[in-house]
Amino acid sequence: MPKMKTKSSAKKRFKITATGKIKVAAAGKRHGMIKRSNKFIRDARGTMILAEPDAKKVIHCYLPNGL
């Protein structure tokens, strides 16, 4: 049976840290910033670490062989 391929879209969206956690960009910043609070814009500026249940799903479904 052949190896599962890593999804190309996942390669572009996720980074795996040295400890095995998954780093992603914060969601909700594509458009509509006028109606967002300044706190939301500040908090969504950088990257965030996915929660453990979500990270397991991402690794199992989209990144079977890592990046």
From Swiss-Prot:
One of its GO terms (biological process) is translation. One of its GO terms (cellular component) is cytosolic large ribosomal subunit. GO terms for molecular function: structural constituent of ribosome. It comes from the Bacteria. Keywords: Ribonucleoprotein, Ribosomal protein. InterPro entries: Ribosomal_bL35, Ribosomal_bL35-like, Ribosomal_bL35_CS, Ribosomal_bL35_sf. HAMAP family: Ribosomal_bL35. Belongs to the bacterial ribosomal protein bL35 family. This is Large ribosomal subunit protein bL35. It comes from Bartonella bacilliformis (strain ATCC 35685 / KC583 / Herrer 020/F12,63). The lineage of its organism: Bacteria, Pseudomonadati, Pseudomonadota, Alphaproteobacteria, Hyphomicrobiales. The gene is rpmI.
